[in-house]
């Protein structure tokens, strides 16, 4: 079961949507804005805006944008690892709650 795109709020005040984490991972995996956009079924402009918004929210540059490609900064590599874990934890929790609800 795929969790809906809700906002995650960190105690320091930054807000990131679950969708933003998925978009970021797609960009980092594809290594290209246009390829990630194609895979996600959104426009490159949508991904570009999202990545800039996420960088502003976190206060760190995550991506190095080059002509036709993307590279992760050190902060981006750290975020990628945490984003994968966060999405995995959300999925596991969602599945566990769904199973528990069926048993009730």
How would you label these PLM feature ranges?
Residues 17-20, 44, 76, 83:
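The N-cap/first-turn positions of alpha helices
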Residues 55-77:
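A short LG(V/I)-centered, amphipathic sequence patch enriched
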Residues 27-44:
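Short helix-boundary/capping micro-motifs
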Residues 30, 39, 53-61:
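Residue cluster at the C-terminal edge of the helix-turn-helix DNA-binding motif
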Residues 1-16:
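Short, intrinsically disordered or compositionally biased N-terminal tails of bacterial proteins
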Residues 98-104:
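Interdomain hinge and pocket-entrance segments immediately C-terminal to HTH DNA-binding domains
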Residues 32-33, 51, 65:
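Helix-turn-helix DNA-binding elements, focusing on the entry/boundary residues of the two helices
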């Amino acid at each position: 079961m795929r969790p809906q795109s809700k906002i995650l709020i960190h105690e320091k005040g930054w807000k990131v949507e679950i969708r933003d984490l998925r978009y970021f991972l797609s960009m980092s995996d594809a290594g290209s804005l246009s390829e990630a956009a194609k895979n996600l079924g959104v426009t490159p402009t949508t991904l570009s805006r999202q990545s800039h918004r996420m960088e502003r929210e976190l206060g760190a540059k995550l991506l190095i944008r080059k002509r036709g490609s993307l590279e992760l900064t050190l902060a981006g590599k750290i975020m990628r690892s945490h984003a994968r874990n966060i999405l995995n934890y959300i999925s596991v929790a969602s599945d566990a709650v769904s199973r528990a609800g069926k048993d009730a």
